[in-house]
């Protein structure tokens, strides 16, 4: 792209991708990258916020647009500064734990006869794990198992609902400490064929393993998985 026009500004949304690989997009020539602090780089500690990183020109332009020309990064909310720095410090370890959980989930469901993407031994670009089910009820019970194995609101039963912006009903499981924190263990899916669960996050490998095994237990008891 730069060979076509060196003045083109290349921007990437790196949500779910931070610390998954050894290098980040700006090390590969991207002018600017952005992401959410309630995802990977917040380490599960940040309650809100986002970040941008890149060339000085891009950051100055973005800061001027967000606040005011001349003020740039000298203003803005700093209420979570301690959590931001502590979360960033913990983020590589937390991302590693969620990746271990994703690999465990992929291998487990492959052995149970389901398809997963990425497969357990494939290179990963982010923390999202897909599991493909044969029926909508299997998908629903998996998400309910994820919720049941969560540290918050484990008593809640996720139900499909007509979420704005979607053509089909959507089920969401997220027993998280911070609402919407995708670095925490969660799963969601549109209730349509193909029946794909999008699972992501996990503050610890143990948390993911517990939630996934809880989901399997529910599916086994309902006759959706045969382990004989």
Where are the model-predicted features located?
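Conserved C-terminal alpha-helix-loop-beta "cap" of PLP-dependent enzymes
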Residues: 111-121, 125-227
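Conserved PLP-enzyme active-site core in the AAT-like
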Residues: 1-100, 109, 113-117, 206-228
